[in-house]
Amino acid sequence: MAAAGSGGAGGPGPGPRGRWGGCLWVRGVLLVLGGLPAGAGAAPVSLGTSPPCRHHVLSDTEVINKVHLKTNHVTKRDADGHLRIKTIYDQSIEELLPEKRYLVKNKLFPQAISYLEKTFQVRRPAGRILLSRQCATNQYLRKENDPHRYCTGECAVHTKCGPVIVPEEHLQQCRVCREGKWPCGAVGVLDPEGVRDADFVLYVGALATERCSHENIISYAAYCQQEAKMDRPIAGYANLCPNMISTQPQEFIGMLSTVKHEIIHALGFSAGLFAFYHDQDGNPLTSRSADGLPPFNYSLGLYQWSDKVVRKVERLWNVRDNKIVRHTVYLLVTPRVVEEARKHFNCPVLEGMELENQGGMGTELNHWEKRLLENEAMTGSHTQNRVLSRITLALMEDTGWYKANYSMAEKLDWGRGLGCEFVRKSCKFWIDQHRQRRQVPSPYCDTLRSNPLQLTCRQDQRAVAVCNLQRFPNPLPPEYQYFDELTGIPAEDLPYYGGSVEIADYCPFSQEFSWHLSGEYQRSSDCRILENQPELFKNYGAEQYGPHSVCLLQKSAFIMEQCERKLSYPDWGSGCYQVSCSPQGLKVWVQDTSYLCSRAGQVLPVRIQMNGWIHNGNLLCPSCWDFCEQCPPETDPPAANLTRALPLDLCSCSSSLVVTLWLLLGNLFPLLAGFLLCVWH
């Protein structure tokens, strides 16, 4: 995968896949939406914008399968321990700047690997891992009843896993056939000890490769060797592009998510491995040729999987002008994935989980469909708040190589319980149905981005967001033209409008964003990150970012008052505020003042004093159940909660009189003191 900070739009080129203006200048601040590349002539865009993930499967000459592991006893499904990943850092990691090296070795990879080791168990090989050597000519022979492969000619000087050179102490003895003839045998040093107490060896590098310079990516990863008994990957690599490693605290969560995503590709979620999956009894789900391998698809450059793993299906797809077209999708149809997908969407007839069908080679088929699982960790771009859901854990179980600990799955709100119409039809059908009922078409949206911005909340209510519906420079493909009408848009222009993230089938949705100043990243709109707290003089809505903060809708724009001065921020609609749960219900905190939400949709009049200003505004209560495990029945708010005691206005007549009296006394005090001193003497 080629992952990046937050992105998901198409790459360069004509038509909808080309670059477009995705930036808004807001009083000197560049607002960049994740997944919106900047148009020509726009201000520079930081790594917050990137192309989709492109997981490049290594070619069949770069991947070595059927690697013999000594005493590799395999049991059926009953794994006996957590997955053990051994991390080997390349010299290029040691050459990073100290703060980047510390981030990679002490935070990013240890935390990612700790999570994955707790999440998965494996059919553990009892022996050590010794990897096969690559051949100088990429040609080799195998002998019947001999588990090793023999290079025709010579072994390669170096064996690589992706761009990283594998240490000699991890490699089997070189075995060759001179001039391609028998007898063949081992040459050179004997087998070293290899890697003990590991199920998977991960080689981590920070090499400035060609991919790093051309694809604007943070990192990429893949597997490079598979063991002989069950075809499970036993070695892989992850390469971090050195110039893209960020040490900013606000970007750590995104980078950690990227590293997890990369390692999961190397462990099993890869189109290059679909043909090697096994059932729960250890039998291959795809038939094997005489050489013990699945058939190879030369047009795809992959081993061809069977329809027990991936199946092609046609959907009836609503588009504009009341037309229905046929939309081809590929579904992953292994048993646990089907079970978890049906439960998640509440669709008992769902045939499987849809794989990505856009983004080009490396994105297609290697990820979940972005339209259906927007912020799931294994979708093809990082737009916001990645979570590793039960569906991905189910896929890893269905490889036949792992058992998943589902208590480690993270909650995925996107698409949850929305039914078959959501998961099997186009987003146009969903949006139109909700428009007819005068309902918000969540998780999609149909509000055009404008200046000033109309802010809303991300679907999980953890970040401020905007609808990413926009105009493209060219008409979208007819299959992705969804709108029969948009306020203020002429009918002839409607084919140009869609969501900014191509791999979400151009479906528009509310998306978090980040602020940039002179091209430099300032902060994101994620409510939970303390470093996103706005400066006091820019905090119009009296917002509070931090671990206990959520996004709340604003009924009206907040106004800052100081004597005769009044200021308001043109971009409004939502903000970040702390909430807490109580026996009385959900409490919203604005600075140190709490407001009780008695029911969803209740208007909270806010008037607080902060930094010498009075902040006036109205917030809308969410449902208590959105954030609390126990909630009282909803009631109308008491009168006392509707009209709260207002803070003292320091510029009112009464307060001005008090101030004037104190000033008068202050001026009179020296005169009075002087008079008393004179009398005393």
Curated annotation (Swiss-Prot):
Obligatory cofactor(s): Zn(2+)
Pfam families hit by this protein: Peptidase_M8
EC number(s) given by UniProt: 3.4.24.-
InterPro entries in UniProt: Peptidase_M8
Gene Ontology CC annotation, any one: cytosol
Molecular function as annotated in GO: metal ion binding; metalloendopeptidase activity
Record: residues binding Zn(2+): H261, H265, H367
UniProtKB keywords: Cell cycle, Cell division, Cytoplasm, Hydrolase, Lipid droplet, Metal-binding, Metalloprotease, Mitosis, Protease, Zinc
Subcellular localization, as worded in the UniProt entry: Cytoplasm; Lipid droplet
Active-site residues, Swiss-Prot/TrEMBL: E262
Cofactor binding description: Binds 1 zinc ion per subunit.
GO annotation, biological process: cell adhesion; cell division; proteolysis
UniProt similarity note: Belongs to the peptidase M8 family.
Functional note: Metalloprotease.
PANTHER family: LEISHMANOLYSIN-LIKE PEPTIDASE
Name this polypeptide is given: Leishmanolysin-like peptidase
Organism: Mus musculus (Mouse)
The gene coding this protein: Lmln
